[in-house]
């Protein structure tokens, strides 16, 4: 849970957070704009001004949720101690045509490295897995150590 003294924001305020956190937003806050049918999280099946049934308010809500979360992490005492990183990675591609198909946006914020880096390396989802496995000294899962999977060292360097 994000809210309350026992939730994520409480942990961030206290500075007591785990070494690794994997945060996945719910359907109301995931920027897909589809929602779950709840009273405050509606999917709009009509085409009257919406983007093919997407609810623009839910896309905005996801943007605000992400902004609030990143700001809370930056304000946390935990962010100021040691080497920390925030990785924001979307799971949808940009629908680009060949030869640049299936590009997804990845943003890495660190409290220690260079800022404004734009990597020329084409990474995939296994690249993040391989990078994390290396950081934590874990064995490779699935295809994370295939020869075509790059470690994201340029995005986490000093």
Where would I find each of the regions flagged by the language model?
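N-terminal pro-sequences and low-complexity stem/linker regions of secreted or lumenal proteins
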Residues: 1-158
